[in-house]
């Protein structure tokens, strides 16, 4: 590989990354300050824990959509992701999970790695659906058990205020499922109680949850006061830059996601989001009533947006790679060091993506 400014856990190295059999074996070079040279940046590949679609395809469309989605997102530097479902009837969710279970066992050439599933709904508050279809219902352990047998579900979004959900949070978190608070009308107290029961993060912080008020802190207040992790959509549409800065100061391991829809990587027009039809225009995706419906954000643009609001490149990278990996307990992803997967992205000095590598394989995304 050519010489780069390589971001490692111990800082910047001017040098070369050496990899074999999909893993980093060495990083050769010397410590540096990228400001002292004009070399490109080599960063860990982006890890997106909230992906509904891309390239015109939607996860809920099933197996025929998965390769399109993973090939689309790898073009923008996402080297691994969680396939994220929508609220839907039980049989539809079961079918998609069954197909995802098989897909997670492979990685087609030229694609990002699917690390597992983020089940966003149906265990959410029907009063805070956002862009979710109206199939929300109370969680039943037998139903969740059936889902878990179909696919590697890593994350479940849940509204903690619904009766019985506190016990589910406790039981599933003990089994290693990351339980996230989201699509909720819960109070501050209910948010804090959910964290105590084992919830570990918040789904698209600020969006589709009870807001912060100085006498009713709400779920947002619980996150800002107590969370170690939370996801946030940094498209500069879903969350004001000022609110982003508040979260960055308050939540140590805040990480960023796209919450991308089928419209990601596509021109303006109409696309599917679960059972909804959404419209991409003016840089966003909306339902017919104007409600924001996921995003068209890509992770390379997320990096540029974080730098735009004042984060150094190293911290922006951390919130797109290392923190998502840490959240899922993935020690071999999200950082560039010997023993880690050779997942990396090269960007020029304007932060434009020029090269992507997934598990040591160079992606020919320019001709995709």
Model-flagged regions — what are they?
Residues 1-31, 357, 361, 366:
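N-terminal metal-binding scaffold of metallo-dependent hydrolase/deaminase domains
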Residues 4, 326, 335-368:
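C-terminal cap of metal-dependent C-N hydrolases
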Residues 46, 53-59, 82-92, 208-224:
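Active-site loop-to-helix "anion-binding N-cap" substructures in soluble metabolic enzymes
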Residues 52, 67-96, 112-125, 151-161, ...:
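Divalent metal-dependent hydrolysis catalytic cores, especially in the metallo-beta-lactamase
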Residues 71-82, 126-150, 193-205, 219-229, ...:
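Active-site gating loops and adjacent loop-to-helix segments of metal-dependent hydrolytic enzymes
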Residues 148-268:
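Active-site core of metal-dependent hydrolases
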Residues 219-229, 249-258, 263-340, 344-347:
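His/Asp/Glu-enriched, well-ordered alpha-helical/loop segment
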